[in-house]
Amino acid sequence: MSLSPHQKTAGWLVGVVVVMGAASFAAVPFYDWFCRVTGFGGTTAVASEAPAEVLDRTIRVRFDASREAGMPWEFRPLQREMEVRIGETGLAFYEAYNPTDRTVAGTASYNVTPDAAGGYFAKIACFCFTEQVLAPGERVEMPVSFYVDPAIVKDRDGRYVRQITLSYTFHQTELPEEQAALAARPAGIDVN
């Protein structure tokens, strides 16, 4: 069975569309992984504890918050900036509020600028490590514990950094299965 030139072209085009779709689907997780591994684009490090060394030099940390289009939450930092000593653990809070009449889940992506500081800004604990689920009308304060690695003062570019901006963007995600089941259940019905 021989295919006509039109059928071959159509088959080739379908293959191109499938490959492009797969590549676009894989691009976001691949880019996220790449940035976390290399610190590219200001991606921060994750640490289990702060370093033992705390320097006298301070650095100003600014906090920024945004939402992707369609994310219904209100989201903001509870402080605009703070001054921390390099190596000292800082603790900041963000607030999220779900003004809708439905349960909404979200995850936060993050970035640090300038890019030279990304590899030296380490988070010990962060709301961005897990998915957040807010019930209708729920308001929460979410902490982020961090430090600036003292090695920044020895970095060719990092030693000139005097201010770091930590930015978060909240993205709406699918509700976890158990939350979706609860949200779909009519009010007043008890499953027990």
From Swiss-Prot:
<feature type="topological domain" description="Periplasmic">
    <location>
        <begin position="31"/>
        <end position="192"/>
    </location>
</feature>
<dbReference type="InterPro" id="IPR007533">
    <property type="entry name" value="Cyt_c_oxidase_assmbl_CtaG"/>
</dbReference>
<keyword id="KW-0812">Transmembrane</keyword>
<dbReference type="GO" id="GO:0005886">
    <property type="term" value="C:plasma membrane"/>
</dbReference>
<protein>
    <recommendedName>
        <fullName>Cytochrome c oxidase assembly protein CtaG</fullName>
    </recommendedName>
</protein>
<keyword id="KW-0997">Cell inner membrane</keyword>
<comment type="function">
    <text>Exerts its effect at some terminal stage of cytochrome c oxidase synthesis, probably by being involved in the insertion of the copper B into subunit I.</text>
</comment>
<comment type="similarity">
    <text>Belongs to the COX11/CtaG family.</text>
</comment>
<keyword id="KW-1003">Cell membrane</keyword>
<dbReference type="Pfam" id="PF04442">
    <property type="entry name" value="CtaG_Cox11"/>
</dbReference>
<keyword id="KW-1133">Transmembrane helix</keyword>
<keyword id="KW-0472">Membrane</keyword>
<dbReference type="GO" id="GO:0005507">
    <property type="term" value="F:copper ion binding"/>
</dbReference>
<keyword id="KW-0186">Copper</keyword>
<keyword id="KW-0735">Signal-anchor</keyword>
<dbReference type="InterPro" id="IPR023471">
    <property type="entry name" value="CtaG/Cox11_dom_sf"/>
</dbReference>
<dbReference type="GO" id="GO:0008535">
    <property type="term" value="P:respiratory chain complex IV assembly"/>
</dbReference>
<feature type="transmembrane region" description="Helical; Signal-anchor for type II membrane protein">
    <location>
        <begin position="10"/>
        <end position="30"/>
    </location>
</feature>
<feature type="topological domain" description="Cytoplasmic">
    <location>
        <begin position="1"/>
        <end position="9"/>
    </location>
</feature>
